[in-house]
């Protein structure tokens, strides 16, 4: 009798193929299936040639070739396609078998699938996988959540193929029940949007404002690799800025300035609004991509308003350091807001997410991997109840040290006409978050004026609510008390 597979993978696009090859490299026997079965043969005769990878030509064939409990990983497009494959798989599975969704599914879908499949005796895991094609092949960041009973069976495979920290720790651990893994992956993607936009704002300020040459820009980002900004996105930015087209000019200058998006940043912003978390920077990064898409409108508007960008005067080195500090401080705010959203969701759904472990999952293998994620892990290990990352002594010190230069950069960008929506929103958030008193007293009075929404008083206990006739005619005031 032939040896059966340890795990099956459905979907032979590049991500699926690379994960399979990664699993094979780590000694796991993988059964590969694709709806278009000719792709199975192409894979077996191509990248998988000479390996122990097994082909399957139907879902029944796939199930028959797997050890029990069967473990089947879906690497297919998120949405209805996932439900289609689940429904098609069910007749060939039995109680205790495991389905893993490794795509970018929206976490409510994962919540639904975990519950529905539990009733059928099938254990479902929704896992975020980050790192792109290279990560999938050589070690991605993996964020599993769902039915915790399944974790012991898939843990050896997923942790083996994941990226590892310098200390050898796997960038894969159990996140929480139901849709916790896909929620954390969604926030990861939102932070990715923010990081990319912040880098672009620094790039434009230095290029068009300060007037750095192409060589100076590349050198600057190369130098930043040796600072707290050290990260995958800084690395690739330095590479991009140095890449020359056939004519010797920088290719990046010929790339059309319209950015695409797949929707996960939008999901993060929508969930922030639903949970009441001020995810200002990430939401602005999504809107920045939306503005970039209005290319024709922007060109017309620039002519209509005679838009020009002013020159940033002063020592280039001084401005480069100021921008570096502003970029780092803004990045801290982005992560702080992201973890605030994760905390709120974890408490709402009772997921019990370990925030330090979440930072570890992102330390290597994924798009947002960076040096200071180790510091984030340290902060949450020192204080698991930390609400605002900027309150940690390490990050508080960076924010305070950067404050003057941060304000200078944002103010100068407004003066010369360079849009910096994310850096500006970051410092504005911090100013608001650290303000003991905000003008919301007037706002709440306005709400009470036109809608009788009531208000609390500073000279009365919290929980006692008042309504006033603000016209001065009648002078009526009502008082009620209820829990808030």
Swiss-Prot record:
GO biological processes: D-gluconate metabolic process; organic acid catabolic process; pentose-phosphate shunt
Single annotated GO MF: NADP binding
Family matches, as Pfam families: 6PGD (PF00393), NAD_binding_2 (PF03446)
Highest taxon of source: Bacteria
Broad class of enzyme this protein falls into: oxidoreductase
Reactions listed under catalytic activity: 6-phospho-D-gluconate + NADP(+) = D-ribulose 5-phosphate + CO2 + NADPH
Cross-referenced InterPro entries: 6-PGluconate_DH-like_C_sf, 6PGD_dom2, 6PGDH_C, 6PGDH_Gnd/GntZ, 6PGDH_NADP-bd, 6PGdom_BS, NAD(P)-bd_dom_sf, Pgluconate_DH
EC identifiers of the protein: 1.1.1.44
Residues annotated to bind NADP(+): 11-16, 34-36, 76-78, 104
Enzyme active site: 185 (proton acceptor), 192 (proton donor)
Pathway it works in: Carbohydrate degradation; pentose phosphate pathway; D-ribulose 5-phosphate from D-glucose 6-phosphate (oxidative stage): step 3/3
Residues where substrate binds: 104, 130-132, 188-189, 193, 262, 289, 447, 453
Keywords from the named record: Gluconate utilization, NADP, Oxidoreductase, Pentose shunt
SMART domains xrefs: 6PGD
PANTHER family named in the record: 6-PHOSPHOGLUCONATE DEHYDROGENASE
Similarity section: Belongs to the 6-phosphogluconate dehydrogenase family.
Function: Catalyzes the oxidative decarboxylation of 6-phosphogluconate to ribulose 5-phosphate and CO(2), with concomitant reduction of NADP to NADPH.
NCBIfam families documented for this protein: gnd (TIGR00873), PRK09287.1 (NF006765)
Subunit composition and interactions: Homodimer.
Name of the protein: 6-phosphogluconate dehydrogenase, decarboxylating
Organism of this sequence: Aggregatibacter actinomycetemcomitans (Actinobacillus actinomycetemcomitans)
């Amino acid at each position: 009798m032939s040896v059966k597979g340890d795990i099956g993978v459905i979907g032979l696009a590049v991500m699926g193929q690379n994960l399979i090859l990664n699993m094979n490299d780590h000694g796991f026997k993988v059964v590969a299936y694709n709806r278009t079965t000719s792709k199975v043969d192409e894979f077996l005769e191509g990248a998988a040639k000479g390996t122990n990878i097994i082909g399957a030509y139907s879902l029944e064939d796939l199930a028959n070739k797997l050890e029990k409990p069967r473990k089947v990983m879906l690497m297919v497009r998120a949405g209805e396609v996932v439900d289609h494959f689940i429904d098609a798989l069910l007749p060939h599975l039995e109680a205790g078998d495991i389905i893993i969704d490794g795509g970018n599914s929206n976490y409510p879908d994962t919540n639904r699938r975990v519950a529905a499949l539990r009733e059928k005796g099938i254990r479902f895991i929704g896992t975020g996988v980050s790192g792109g094609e290279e990560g999938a092949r050589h070690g991605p960041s993996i964020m599993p959540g769902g039915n915790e009973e399944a974790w012991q069976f898939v843990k050896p495979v997923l942790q083996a193929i994941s990226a590892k920290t310098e200390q050898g720790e796997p960038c894969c651990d159990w996140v929480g029940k139901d849709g916790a893994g896909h929620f954390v992956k969604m926030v990861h993607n939102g932070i990715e949007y923010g990081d990319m936009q912040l880098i672009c704002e620094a790039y434009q300020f230095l290029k068009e404002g300060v007037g750095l040459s192409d060589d100076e820009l590349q050198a600057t980002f190369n130098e930043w690799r040796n600072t707290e900004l050290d990260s995958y996105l800084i690395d690739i930015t330095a590479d991009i800025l140095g890449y020359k087209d056939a004519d010797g000019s920088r290719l990046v200058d010929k790339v059309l300035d319209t950015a695409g998006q797949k929707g996960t940043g939008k999901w993060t912003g929508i969930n922030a609004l639903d949970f009441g978390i001020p995810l200002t920077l990430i939401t602005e990064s999504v809107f920045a991509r939306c503005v970039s898409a209005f290319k024709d409108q922007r060109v017309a508007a620039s002519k209509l308003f005679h838009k020009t960008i002013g020159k940033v005067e002063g020592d280039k080195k001084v401005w480069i350091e100021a921008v570096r500090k502003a970029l780092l401080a803004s990045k801290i705010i982005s992560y702080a807001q992201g973890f605030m959203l994760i905390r709120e969701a974890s408490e709402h759904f009772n997921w019990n997410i370990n925030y330090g472990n979440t930072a570890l999952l992102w330390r290597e293998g994924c798009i947002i991997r960076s040096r200071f994620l180790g510091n984030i892990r340290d902060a949450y290990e020192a204080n698991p109840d930390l609400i605002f990352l900027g309150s940690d002594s390490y990050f508080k010190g960076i924010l305070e040290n950067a404050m003057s230069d941060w304000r200078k950069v944002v103010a100068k960008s407004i003066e010369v006409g360079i849009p910096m929506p994310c850096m500006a929103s970051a410092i504005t958030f911090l100013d608001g978050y650290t303000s003991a008193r905000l003008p919301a007293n007037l706002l709440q009075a306005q709400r009470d004026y036109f809608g009788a929404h009531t208000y609390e008083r500073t000279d009365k206990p919290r929980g006692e609510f008042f309504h006033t006739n603000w016209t001065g005619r009648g002078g009526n005031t009502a008082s009620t008390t209820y829990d808030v």
